[in-house]
UniProtKB/Swiss-Prot annotation:
Main location: nucleus
Purpose: Protamines substitute for histones in the chromatin of sperm during the haploid phase of spermatogenesis. They compact sperm DNA into a highly condensed, stable and inactive complex.
Annotated Gene Ontology cellular component terms: nucleosome; nucleus
Gene Ontology molecular function: DNA binding
Tissue-wise expression: Testis.
UniProt keyword list: Chromosome, Developmental protein, Differentiation, DNA condensation, DNA-binding, Nucleosome core, Nucleus, Spermatogenesis
Source organism: Trachypithecus geei
DNA-binding among keywords: yes
Similarity remark: Belongs to the protamine P1 family.
Stated name of the protein: Sperm protamine P1
Biological processes, Gene Ontology terms: chromosome condensation; sperm DNA condensation
Location of this chain's protein in the cell: Nucleus; Chromosome
Amino acid sequence: MARYRCCRSQSRSRCCRPRRRCRRRRRRSCRARRRATRCCRRRYRLRCRRY
């Protein structure tokens, strides 16, 4: 699974792209995941979940 991070420039409800797993093959899926994810705080870490 790709790991997402929260961007400081963006709102907390949005997530950044995964670091090394967005390329030609999965651009559309990455964008779709990016739109349908939220950043949540759990156990003092920022993770993204689909909602």
